[in-house]
Amino acid sequence: MNLHEYQAKELLASYGLPVQGGILAHNGEEAAAAYDKLGGKFAVVKAQVHAGGRGKAGGVKVVKSREKAKEVAESLIGTNLVTYQTDANGQPVNSVLVCEDMYPVQTELYLGAVVDRSTRRVTFMASTEGGVEIEKVAAETPEKIFKVTVDPLVGLQPCQAREVAFQLGLKDKQINEFAKLMTGAYKAFVENDFALFEVNPLAVRENGALACVDGKIGIDSNALYRLPKIAELRDKSQENERELKASEFDLNYVALEGNIGCMVNGAGLAMATMDIIKLKGGQPANFLDVGGGATKDRVVEAFKLILEDKSVKGVLINIFGGIVRCDMIAEAIVAAVKEINVNVPVVVRLEGNNAELGAKILNESGLKLTSADGLNDAAEKIVAAVNA
């Protein structure tokens, strides 16, 4: 689950991080009032969406009057912002954050943290190349990124934070200020189950003080059950409608841009299924894992989700019977196809527990379901059916 910039800044401020002041506005009048309240020579109006690249997409504007603040806010709110991180439809802008005047600054830095799967620990990344995409820095000048891995038994040590401060070129009081900031960020990361933390840029102001000009936070969705206050911050308008509906039925669904719908049990098998579809010249329309406890209702909902995507021209169902029996899945597929008007080719591959019985149920159903003998055969049949 992602947080908006204003939510991220509020959370980080509660842990003692110095953040750029800002006021949330839901319309032009509120933006104009926010400009007056901030009282600077200029302000920055930022569209609040769950996507990076807002500046290049026109979602971040500098304004020098209350009238301009109102004009920019009205031009953004109610529209969809398309960036390099969104699909062609973009993300809806429901509000803007009017931020205080902080520029010019001495320099812009970068500070971020993720859970490093290779070390299974929180790893901080810092760079003197703030204000630009960290992926670009990693690709072009990786030597300018400093990494610190935190031992979960002892937490982030002050000496580690000071070492990063030295590498960033900070001096005197800035070193202790940065150490406090980084320690607060680690505490926030652990206590709120962050999956991602990023401040870009972390500005060094003309007076030498540090300030988080932007804030990006991603929460581990698996931990939301123990984070009720964080869960309340979820903005469902920023999520794909089908993905949102899938989560209500405990279906793992990710929309893609192909034309072959996939229904699979198991994340690994789902990824392998998408790979072999690509290998055979097809394009998967989605990732959909119905899980080990697939039932008729879940299969029906999975079918509905897949077919709501009008670009889907065929469906490949790939089930490995382990925990779940193939005959039960076959019965659910038959019931789902009868309940829903499925007018695209459907190829079914069943393997494992009661696979033969499952295939018999499908063959005797009288429905236009194509059985496949193995994953390779299934991929070839669905690609051929879609291209026919």
From Swiss-Prot:
UniProt keyword annotations, A-Z: ATP-binding, Ligase, Magnesium, Metal-binding, Nucleotide-binding, Tricarboxylic acid cycle
Gene Ontology cellular component list: cytosol; succinate-CoA ligase complex
Pathway: Carbohydrate metabolism; tricarboxylic acid cycle; succinate from succinyl-CoA (ligase route): step 1/1
Oligomer and partners: Heterotetramer of two alpha and two beta subunits.
Cofactor(s), by name: Mg(2+)
EC number(s) stated in the UniProt entry for this protein: 6.2.1.5
Cofactor descriptive note: Binds 1 Mg(2+) ion per subunit.
Name of protein: Succinate--CoA ligase [ADP-forming] subunit beta
GO biological process, one term: tricarboxylic acid cycle
Function noted in UniProt: Succinyl-CoA synthetase functions in the citric acid cycle (TCA), coupling the hydrolysis of succinyl-CoA to the synthesis of either ATP or GTP and thus represents the only step of substrate-level phosphorylation in the TCA. The beta subunit provides nucleotide specificity of the enzyme and binds the substrate succinate, while the binding sites for coenzyme A and phosphate are found in the alpha subunit.
Residue numbers binding substrate: N265, G322, I323, V324
Family: Belongs to the succinate/malate CoA ligase beta subunit family.
Binding-site list for ATP: K46, G53, R54, G55, E100, Y103, E108
Origin superkingdom: Bacteria
Binding-site residues, Mg(2+): N200, D214
GO molecular function terms attached to this record: ATP binding; magnesium ion binding; succinate-CoA ligase (ADP-forming) activity; succinate-CoA ligase (GDP-forming) activity
HAMAP family: Succ_CoA_beta
Positions of the ATP-grasp domain: 9-245
Catalytic reaction(s) noted: succinate + ATP + CoA = succinyl-CoA + ADP + phosphate; GTP + succinate + CoA = succinyl-CoA + GDP + phosphate
